[in-house]
Amino acid sequence: MPLLTIDHVTVAFGNGPRKLVAVDDVSLTVERGEFLCLLGPSGCGKSTLLKVVSGLLAAHSGRVTLDTQERRDGLESVMVWQEPTLIPWRRIDDNVALSLELRGVPRAERRERAVEALKLLGIADFAAYFPRQLSGGMRQRAGIARALVADPRILLMDEPFAAVDAQTRRILQEQVLMLTQDLHKTVIFVTHSIEEALLLGDRIAVMSARPGRIKALIEVEFPRPRDPHIVRTARFQDLEEHIWDLLRGEAARAELET
């Protein structure tokens, strides 16, 4: 039985002639431990769908169920955004431990758990720093550590590497690849990058231009644990070209609508 089921979800904004359908009749399932990537052109509803899964946004119709129970809040999922939204006056370890603090976990224990999560991301030496003292990539690592400390059943990631430089992006991709494999996390990951989706995902849901629909579901056949060097293989490049063939027309249509 799937961990998460998205059942005929439609999201619309406004009414009458100004009504805008962002997501149209989307159905998906996500298995336990699966890494599902949502891939599509700008404005196709990827982030909107993720917000519905998180409980931050209500669907116009359809429903989202977790273990057959309808989702009514975001308590069993945690979102990692493009910007990590760290609280500027809190130390990094206190930012990471925020969810534990809200649960009433004692201070010493939550700091210990925060430092352990920061170790996984390679920035434990910066636990006592403040967000303004860290680079963008390090702040994003702290945001990922904060999500891991919360130990959600589903980790939702909305283009988390879009705001960092190319070298940092590659490092973060490799870290997330290793961590999600080692921790057996269930992940829904939004991206514009075909390469990123193929590197990280078990499946890729290719979305159409607005209104966003599922155009294709691609099984990513590369075994796990996955080596980042698969990007250099002929099979990877063939899949990348196949997905671009699916997306080319959608990207052009999205560009005309902006």
Predicted regions: what they are:
Residues M1-L3, A12-D25:
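A short, flexible loop at the N-terminus of ABC-type nucleotide-binding domains that lies
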Residues L39-P41:
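The feature captures the beta-strand-to-loop junction immediately N-terminal to the Walker
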Residues S54:
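Helix-to-loop junction immediately C-terminal to a conserved catalytic motif
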Residues G62-D73:
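Conserved ABC transporter NBD signature motif
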Residues R90-L98:
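Short coil-to-helix segment of the ABC ATPase nucleotide-binding domain corresponding to the Q-loop/switch region
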Residues E101, A108-F126, M178:
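Conserved ABC ATPase "signature" region
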Residues Y129-R132, A150:
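Conserved signature/switch motifs of ABC ATPase nucleotide-binding domains
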Residues I144:
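Hydrophobic anchor residue at the start of the ABC signature
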